[in-house]
Amino acid sequence: MPELPEVETTLRGLSPHLVGQRIHGVILRRPDLRWPIPEQIERLLPGATITNVRRRAKYLLIDTDAGGSVLLHLGMSGSLRVLPGDTLPRAHDHVDISLQSGRLLRFNDPRRFGCLLWQSGTQAHDLLAALGPEPLSDAFTGDYLHALAQGRRAAVKTFLMDQAVVVGVGNIYAAESLHRAGISPLREAGKVSLERYRRLADAVKDILAYAIQRGGTTLRDFISPDGAPGYFEQELFVYGREGEACKQCGRVLKHATIGQRATVWCGSCQR
């Protein structure tokens, strides 16, 4: 599933092509994605102008002057591309939004776990209402994590991936951040010290910022708007490396399922 760096990469690739563009039309080839596409998409978007494109957690919001925003989530396999207007649709090309420039924004989603919804006015959609702080913001600190973790018995990896704690940190970047901070993903969240949470917050910020710089992680289905691969996958220390040697100490990496997610870590470097 695309995580925060992949969504941020998508945002940065799309924005120059979308902001200020008038929408000519909308084609819905498959309106039943994770949730049905609401009728406002077809009714309100034609004739509207895109005023901004932004990100909240793993969601993209395309703001318009039509009294609301398109709320997008890429799901497990979704991608957004800006293409010439005469580009023929392929399998799983579910939505086209045609633009004044003669180009179109196309949403492709083979597994249909993504969504295309409508957020009215300035009121946050229900999907955004209970989200935690952005990990690259000043609100996300080790002190914040430590205070929130008190009394929690869940594994620290599960705690870090809780979107009510901090948004956008999925399986890849949680595993990599815990490795850099030297914290076992199995340790109870409430038993991690303040000093170690400060290291963890710093690791999350550094790794996410670097992954964005590298264009995200190309794993399975993720495609950036220009079709270019992300290069962070080449620098992964633990994620997806079960049974391989730790790049720091050389010992064989361990594997377990934590919170129904595959987890790889180094039993020597992470305590």
From Swiss-Prot:
Record GO terms (molecular function): 8-oxo-7,8-dihydroguanine DNA N-glycosylase activity; class I DNA-(apurinic or apyrimidinic site) endonuclease activity; damaged DNA binding; zinc ion binding
A Pfam family of this chain: H2TH
Upper taxonomic lineage: Bacteria, Pseudomonadati, Pseudomonadota, Gammaproteobacteria, Lysobacterales
Cofactor comment text: Binds 1 zinc ion per subunit.
Family per similarity comment: Belongs to the FPG family.
Oligomer and partners: Monomer.
Chain ranges of zinc fingers (FPG-type): 237-271
Protein name: Formamidopyrimidine-DNA glycosylase
PANTHER family: FORMAMIDOPYRIMIDINE-DNA GLYCOSYLASE
Function: Involved in base excision repair of DNA damaged by oxidation or by mutagenic agents. Acts as a DNA glycosylase that recognizes and removes damaged bases. Has a preference for oxidized purines, such as 7,8-dihydro-8-oxoguanine (8-oxoG). Has AP (apurinic/apyrimidinic) lyase activity and introduces nicks in the DNA strand. Cleaves the DNA backbone by beta-delta elimination to generate a single-strand break at the site of the removed base with both 3'- and 5'-phosphates.
Organism annotation: Xanthomonas axonopodis pv. citri (strain 306)
Cofactor: Zn(2+)
Presence of keyword Metal-binding: yes
Keywords linked to the UniProt accession: DNA damage, DNA repair, DNA-binding, Glycosidase, Hydrolase, Lyase, Metal-binding, Multifunctional enzyme, Zinc, Zinc-finger
NCBIfam families per the UniProt record, alphabetical: fpg, PRK01103.1
Annotated signal sequence range: none
Sites where the protein binds DNA: H92, R111, R152
